[in-house]
Amino acid sequence: MKWRGMILVCAISCLALAAVLAAQFRSGPPWRHPVVSSQSFHIGGAVIQVDFGLGTLDLPHDQVMQWVKNSASSVATYYGRFPVSQDRVLIEPADGRDILRGTTWGGVDGFQGFTRIVLGKQTTQQDLDEDWEMTHEFVHTAFPSLDDEHTWMEEGLATYIEPIARVQRGFLRPERIWADMMHDMPKGDPESLDRGLDNTHTWGRTYWGGAQFCLQADVMIRQQTQNRKGLQDALRAIVNAGGTIDKDWPLRKALEIGDSATGTHVLVQLYDAMRDAPKPVDLAGLWKQLGVIRDGDGVRFDDHAPLAAIRQAITRTPATGIVLPKP
């Protein structure tokens, strides 16, 4: 979930929005909440400060720190470096178990990125090992803040990139994320009265419609470049041009930079096709082309499928290698 300025960019009802607003700012802005301990680490050209708020956790802080480091390493591996040079994470204990809420802001108190994580006091190591949300929130730092009608791009990117980054880092297997995509991508299909991604702000279209855009773009870029480049190259170029969460950009500017990096027009053309009209994706056909075959609750791969090499390239650890945290 991403917060930009004073508007919470999340496809939820007005009543739910009011409740989230009240919870987030009940004790003042989250970045001003009390801190009882603090640690920092370096990764991929960045310094990440991790603060722990009031309250206790069943887990030692060192185990929580390792979870944050693993998530940062996944994102830095995908982008070749951590997207912003100064980042802050606030861990606030709360009653319950698991990661209860995550929100990311840009340009707060000297930090390019600031993420607040509400972590259940009874959270276990297994919960952290299986978590996706910390990585999702870090991905938000790697794209400029957009006007509200483009929330689908911000959330869709984080939804699509998070599992791929974790595979590239070695924390997930490709079979797992392709099975998850086969299961979840249909949630982004347009329904009746859909008016395109810029104008249809349901939860499904915001998160999974945005993810469908990213998957299509990744495959199309690789098709047009003989698999030499993909969405990853476009997104790295956007970050390298300064397109991070603390900057307000028009979406088209970011897409044009990405297209220039891949030598294609895929991002701009796909956006123009999907922005104002429903454009259903033939997911069944795409899975077949990629060689992803349902097998019980999971999937198996057909490495002789027409686009099998593209599927493999999407999750392959980049040539720049794994980026590890340092003290």
Summary of predicted features, one role per range:
Residues 37-150:
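Juxtacatalytic substrate-recognition/specificity segment
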